[in-house]
Swiss-Prot record:
Gene Ontology MF: a single term: gamma-glutamylcyclotransferase activity
Keyword Lyase applies: yes
Name of the protein: Gamma-glutamyl cyclotransferase verK
Record gene name: verK
Taxonomic lineage of the native organism: Eukaryota, Fungi, Dikarya, Ascomycota, Pezizomycotina
PANTHER family in UniProt: GAMMA-GLUTAMYLCYCLOTRANSFERASE
Description of the deletion phenotype: Dicreases the production of 11'-deoxyverticillin A.
Superkingdom of origin: Eukaryota
Amino acid sequence: MTNTERSSSWKASSIPDQPMWYFGYGSNMKASSMADRKVTPLSTKIVTVPTHFVTFDIFGIPYSEPSYASLEQFPDGGTGKLDLVHHISRTQVLPACGVAHLLSPNDFHRLLVTEGSGVVYNLVEVQAYEMNKDGQPIPAPFTVHTLKAKWPQRPNGTPSARYMVRFLGLLSSSTYYQY
């Protein structure tokens, strides 16, 4: 681990008595997913984590959910660039974008339990930057907690249709709140 990523304990007894920021980059970007888990964010911000990218490296269910999402740090402590190569084409891997939810201690714990933290995920701390209305990061980082694969699969798997609908739905929406 580097200075941009730090492991955290996920046990209920170690969760502080104050609200904590959680970085959602998959289904937790959608407000209805949070409601289904009976988690009510105190505040929500659209953010980026420029040191990490979204990857699909957790074994899933063949055909219906081939891989689950996780985060991985860019090379060189989060400062390196990374390209996907397919035959002769190259595509730059973009930094992780998602939402930061400010959660009460009880909601934070509930979210960790429903996500499988401690089983397939480790809880890590990373630095996030809120995005302004023009889609640019505001230069005031803050700490968020998020989940990362405990045992990443290599090579990475394929995202499911469910993830693709989430990502494309968010991209086609003019704001997160409409989505």
